[in-house]
A protein has these predicted regions:
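Conserved class I S-adenosyl-L-methionine
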Residues: 1-43
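Conserved SAM-binding loop of SAM-dependent methyltransferases across substrates and taxa
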Residues: 57-68
Length: 213
């Protein structure tokens, strides 16, 4: 799915990518992403392969490669984010250890290889067919499957309703949603993975990690 036709590729443009990259270089990973990274490192990432779906500027890729992961694959609909991820990868000396695929993971899934670790950082909540996304991505995880999703609280739901209203008024096609964690859990367990870590970070985010049985 090309960024010129994908609502995600169009919405997450160069302005977003530049701001995210600047923030990452100045402050490092945000608290929720850092929590997932630390949980993955606690399980062991040395020599591991990573599949990072919708990873934006590639924060998880950069951090795990710096911590001993062998290789990473980034699948992203936004060409602006892919360019920023490549730029940061080159700057960190990771060129040759990262493969990039431009498009919708669900559409590309058959051509995307499995990896020891699969991550989706704030992706499930903005993808229309979340169950298919989770099912296909969980099946690619040989060892660990980590996701970050909005907490299922009244406050978060109200924020998302307001955000979607603004997006509608701006004529954007991107929408967000709160997907109940137990619904995600059922799909992930069907793929043969079990919960090994769960933590709330701030008022909005839930960080969850699964391990293959």
């Amino acid at each position: 799915m090309d960024s010129t036709t994908s609502p995600y590729g169009t919405f997450y443009n160069e302005k977003f990518a530049t701001a995210d990259l600047r923030s990452y270089r100045k402050k490092g990973p945000n608290p929720w992403t850092r929590t997932l990274i630390e949980a993955l490192k606690a399980e062991g990432v040395e020599g591991a392969t990573l599949l990072d779906i919708g990873g934006g500027i590639g924060v998880i890729q950069h951090e795990l490669l710096a911590s001993g992961a062998a290789r990473a694959t980034g699948v992203e609909t936004s060409s602006a984010y892919l360019a920023a991820a490549r730029e940061e990868s080159d700057r960190r000396g990771h060129t040759g250890r990262v493969t990039y695929q431009h498009g919708d993971f669900v559409e590309l899934a058959e051509s995307v290889p499995a990896a020891d670790i699969v991550t989706l950082d704030r992706v499930i909540n903005v993808y229309p067919d979340w169950a298919r996304l989770v099912g296909l991505s969980a099946a690619r995880a040989r060892r660990l499957y980590g996701v970050i999703v909005p907490r299922d609280t009244r406050f978060v739901r109200l924020v998302i309703v307001a955000m979607n209203l603004v997006l509608r008024l701006q004529r954007q096609r991107v929408r967000a949603a709160v997907v109940p964690l137990d619904a995600i859990d059922r799909v992930v367990r069907e793929a043969g993975l079990s919960l090994c870590f769960s933590r709330t970070v701030g008022p909005a985010w839930q960080v969850v990690l699964y391990r293959r049985d």
